[in-house]
Amino acid sequence: MATLAYSIEVEGLEDETLVVRGFHGQESLSNSVFLGQACYGFRYQMQLASRVSNLTADQMVDKRAELKLYRNSQLVQRVHGIVRAFSQGDIGHHHTFYQLTLVPALERLSLRHNSRIFQKQTVPEILSILLQEMGIHDYAFALKRDCVQREFCVQYRESDIDFLHRLAAEEGLVYSFVHEAGKHTLYFSDASDSLSKLPEPIPYNALAGGTMDTPYIHGLTYRTQAEVSEVQLKDYSFKKPAYSFLQTVQGTELDYQQTRYQHFDAPGRYKDDVNGAAFSQIRLDYLRRHAHTATGQSNEPLLRAGYKFDLQEHLDPAMNRDWVVVSINHQGEQPQALQEEGGSGATTYNNQFSLIPGHLHWRAEPQPKPQVDGPMIATVVGPEGEEIFCDEHGRVKIHFPWDRYSNGNEQSSCWVRVSQGWAGSQYGFIAIPRIGHEVIVSFLNGDPDQPIITGRTYHATNTPPYTLPEHKTKTVLRTETHQGEGFNELSFEDQAGKEQIYLHAQKDFDGLIENDHTTVIRHDQHLTVENDQFTQIKHNQHLTVEGESRTLVKLDCSSEIGGSLQQKIGSKAIYDAGTEVHLKAGNKLVLEAGNELTIKAGGSFIKVDAGGVHVVGSAINLNSGGSAGSGSGYGGKMAELPQGVDKAKTPQEIELAAVTPTQQSMSPLLKARQIEALKGPAPVCEVCEEAKGN
């Protein structure tokens, strides 16, 4: 008959300081619950005794410990971990009773809570950081699928262990432990064929009783139940807005159930087909993890969670196959540990386990992702020396106040999309938040991994363009010159009696009107050009001045007319030249007056009127020599043409959606009538009022 024995070693204590009275432990693939408490791979409650009555928590808690199991004096199993809890019980004549809880070093991550951002890292890389921060270096990954790098991954107000479980479950990773002398190794895998396998098969004994030298399994129950038969996930990416990202995965081994149990979910938390297909399969594996299970009991201490084994000698040949241990509970009793105070019972060991067939993949339960309660405040960041930093999509980098690891530069976040007031295909509104601006950040579906800027706010340093509340009636759009001093502005003053639209261009102001431009000014217009003005009218110009017209030219004035110049003056036409007036006609010059025509120079004159022609001078010379006087001749300058305005690029042609009657714009005829109505003196557009009435 086999003999069993248990012992425990605790870091810093002499061997055999403690003896094992009994233990009750649980192991599981990834996390589970044991006696109402979280079990992170394994958790053992141990009843101990010692002839030392003054052991303290300082000597026990957070120390490494190792439970050893012997069969026929041979070490067959060990459990290595750290002491999470320690308590002292009754003090007897020879022994003091103690209890301790043995857990993996991984449980230390449950005592850390954080918020931080990981960028451009895979899940194994992120998990490695979490483990190494706690001094855990005994870990390994055995993965069949390469995890895709995550652009932006946030640990948001959650413990390190919850964050680890969440990421691992998303990628289909489960963990278990390999126990060796003096250490335990955390082992991540994503497929059952990556798990270790016991070297020898374990026999099944349905009629077992008493104690046998050979370990065996008994009480095996196989269970089949209907589960989800199909998973369909969907998501969206702004980089491929027309692509559905729909992924569908069908279950296998469905002969015993209906195939119409579809599980649809969106968003699927992926942005490409590779991840979408993998996540869909992982979801299906999880939802079907209880479709084929088995439970049983044994006295084989080599059975551990995360191991595979072959069963043999079962009466049902289908059961003699490979199995994966999903979870197992161990119980051991050692009454003889108390020696003279102990009972006469033998040392015992047994376990109860749950299994899945070896070809199936066990998936951990997906952990709920932290939800952001509402919008957050962040600051736009970028490289030193830059004022505006964005990518081709108008996205910017931001820094959250809670991100204590950020340096407040372009590495602080991923590229974050910015909501704009209007966004179409190459048309709409665009205003890029600048470095240092405070923005309001929302999160798609409350997901901290998907921030989007939905607003901007002023604060004590970034103040409004005008002081408040003094200028509370102003609506302002003011920009700031990039890499310089100055601003552009369009503002509206709405104070009664002071209403105003103000436009300021720091440098140039260009306008391009493809058709008509109509302006009606009810009062004065003032125009000051501090340098040159150039105007070109390619067809006709009509100018009507119903009062006076005054022009002051302080230097020369040139006018060149390609055709005729005709002027009609209702009263007088008076020209006053300081030195000379020169009239020249290429063919003929006619001066005509209704009553009188006078030519006067140097005290002499010629006067023509109804009474005749009067010539008066100191001397009148007819054909007596001399020559005609000459004028200066034409010296006018040609007008220069104005600069053109570059036309904005026309949006690329796109296929427009069908327009319903309720979406139709007003008819072109109505627009034309409105323009004509605006040319009239009425203060209200009669055509507009008519349209409202209809």
Swiss-Prot record:
Highest taxon of the lineage: Bacteria
UniProtKB keywords: Secreted
Keyword Secreted attributed: yes
Record localization: Secreted
GO cellular component terms listed in the entry, alphabetical order: extracellular region
Residue pairs linked by disulfide bridges in the UniProt entry: none
Gene ablation phenotype (knockout): Mutants are unable to secrete VasX.
Similarity field: Belongs to the VgrG protein family.
PANTHER family referenced in this protein's UniProt entry, alphabetically: PTHR32305, TYPE VI SECRETION SYSTEM SPIKE PROTEIN VGRG3 (PTHR32305:SF11)
Function recorded in the entry: Part of the type VI secretion system specialized secretion system, which delivers several virulence factors in both prokaryotic and eukaryotic cells during infection. Forms the spike at the tip of the elongating tube formed by haemolysin co-regulated protein Hcp. Allows the delivery of the VasX antibacterial toxin to target cells where it exerts its toxicity.
Protein name (record): Type VI secretion system spike protein VgrG2
Organism of this sequence: Vibrio cholerae serotype O1 (strain ATCC 39315 / El Tor Inaba N16961)
